Amino acid sequence: MSSQLPILTVSQLNRQVKGFLENEIGLVHVEGEISNLSKPSSGHYYFTLKDSTAQIRCAFFKNRHSSSLLRNFNDGQQIVASGKLSLYEARGEYQLIVEEIVEAGMGILYQRFEELKIKLAREGLFNPERKKTLPRIPETIGIITSPTGAAIQDILSTLARRFPIARIIIYPSEVQGQAAPQQLVNALKLANTHKRCQVLILARGGGSIEDLWAFNDEYLARQIAISEIPVVSGIGHETDFTIADFVADYRAETPTAAATAVTPNCIELFNILDTAIYRLHDAIIRLVKGLQLKLNHLIDKIASPRQTISTYWQTLDYLERQLISAMTQFINLNINKMNLFSTRLQANNPKTQIERTKIQLRQLILQLTQEIRIKVNQLKHQLSTNLSTLHAVSPLATLDRGYAIVSKNQRILFAAQQAQIGDTIDVRLAKGSLACEVTQIKD
């Protein structure tokens, strides 16, 4: 016995072999016949996979499968088991820890699926950056599916509940069989030619891999990728994945989930509407305050009421008309939008909410109009008062009381000594002026 090699216990040896099997050998696919199938109450499944010359023990643990998965598999059935090798240390038996089971013959389909998936991924068809954003509130929704399947009923009922005002266009197509891929492609092309939809739902109900195989077609995948309209896939159940799911702009777990993904909720729309009304009211208040500041600024800049009062009156009247007109147009525009929502939402009868909003908007118009006119009248009254005050202290008002302003060579005289006998002086009266000659000077 060589002294160079360490002496291992059985446990150590089995542990090393187990580590090698689990870490060095990756996922394997093994085809064989089921025998000695055991289904204990723990939920785990144990069986032997064999061919004509060899066999291997297999373990399919509960957390790897659904409870109903192996009900369709029995002793003597040919399957393909996918999993990783391990070692049961207590008995030194190596085994296959199964992760997935399919019927024999299905392995070819999975291989084709993986090859196409890798090919399209390398071309960038699955990249998130090339995927289009879904519209927030689509007016028209296109549905590509069988018109007689369960999927279309699930989609229509969900759309009717969540967003009944949306228009629906159904592009009928087979979703299973040899003709299905080309029909699905034609439906996608037709929807893009019409350009009437803001989003498309590509859907069908659940089924086996053969049932869903039409959605693994390469030509269909490329058509989804070049679609100008965002495509939402809702194919099969949550655990089903197709090539179309990877290429679609959004993958939903089921047809119902796809309908939910493309629609807002009516309650959310009402919240948006309430927010818009609040912002409208706030914008009008800011507009009024801004115009008030502008008017105050103009008033402060008045230099001579006699020269500018007429212009300011006209400006004030013009601003009043412009403000009322702009406010009325703004409110009427939103009333028109409210009327449009009222028409589309008749199916859900939100009439009371809409009428209440209309009344609030009309009251807002009347209230703001009245407040603006009151403020304008106050400003007019203030201007009139200021004008009267300025006139009262004006030198011209003194002339009205019988006084005169005497000037010589356009310079006002304050004392008799500023003039000489023979000078010509101007005497300005309240009405008119006199040119007088000085004949006598008195102290």
UniProtKB/Swiss-Prot annotation:
Catalytic activity: Exonucleolytic cleavage in either 5'- to 3'- or 3'- to 5'-direction to yield nucleoside 5'-phosphates
Similarity field: Belongs to the XseA family.
Function: Bidirectionally degrades single-stranded DNA into large acid-insoluble oligonucleotides, which are then degraded further into small acid-soluble oligonucleotides.
Record localization: Cytoplasm
InterPro entries assigned to the protein according to its UniProt record, in alphabetical order: Exonuc_VII_L, Exonuc_VII_lsu_C, NA-bd_OB-fold, OB-fold_nuc-bd_dom
Keyword Transcription regulation set for record: no
GO terms, molecular function: exodeoxyribonuclease VII activity; nucleic acid binding
Organism this protein belongs to: Legionella pneumophila (strain Lens)
Keywords: Cytoplasm, Exonuclease, Hydrolase, Nuclease
Assigned GO CC terms: cytoplasm; exodeoxyribonuclease VII complex
Name of protein: Exodeoxyribonuclease 7 large subunit
UniProt cross-references to Pfam families, sorted A to Z: Exonuc_VII_L (PF02601), tRNA_anti_2 (PF13742)
EC numbers: 3.1.11.6
Quaternary structure and interacting proteins, as annotated: Heterooligomer composed of large and small subunits.
GO biological process: DNA catabolic process
